[in-house]
Amino acid sequence: MKVWMWICLAGLAAGVTLLLCRSTAETQPTDKPSADNTEKPASASPSFTDPAKLTEKAPETFKAQFDTTRGKFTIEVTRSLSPNGADRFYNLVRSGYFTDIAFFRVVPGFMCQFGIHGDPNVSAKWREAPIPDDPVKGSNARGTITFATAGPNTRTAQLFINFGDNTGLDGQGFSPFGKVTEGMDVVDKIYGGYGDAPQFGGHGPDQGRIQMEGNPYLKKDFPNLDYIKSATIVSADGSK
């Protein structure tokens, strides 16, 4: 199913979606199962401001631990499931990209989405660094993690974790590369009270404004959102 996503690349104006100063159709996870104070974004570490330098091949298996405002959860990645996706995720985690990143789109029973950086300058760089698609080898079962897309070969830094068995996404090119193996109860508690994005009948954040304004917009207008505090690689190929 097509969805509309906004990410304005030049002169950001007025899910996951792209707005190149126009709205574009995106193949997004949208097949839902039936039935603070304003602040400046923290300055970005050079380690994640240059995507071209973050291309290290991921271990065949590794675990990443996420510390969030709801608690901790661990994702186990199997590179063979989605090599390009696993490599991108590995580099995002090890660079510190996920510090203070919001779960900005949370649809109970469906999925929670994250990955737009709190600094618009950083987001802009990653939008211009897509990775090639991977064949879908796994299913979007409960607890799996998958990159959002804006069409063929457009995966960048936005991801989602499936709350349910969303097998309908498998035929749409969403290629899971890992799964939550510890702390799925934490993931289930991520705040979803705002519902989906406005264009889908919810009251959640507008992705175009996140891209333009970053975390200050989210923390001012959506104070109940949960955030990733940090993410770290905790094991690779089974060794600490």
What kind of feature is each model-predicted range?
Residues 2-240:
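Cyclophilin-like peptidyl-prolyl cis-trans isomerases
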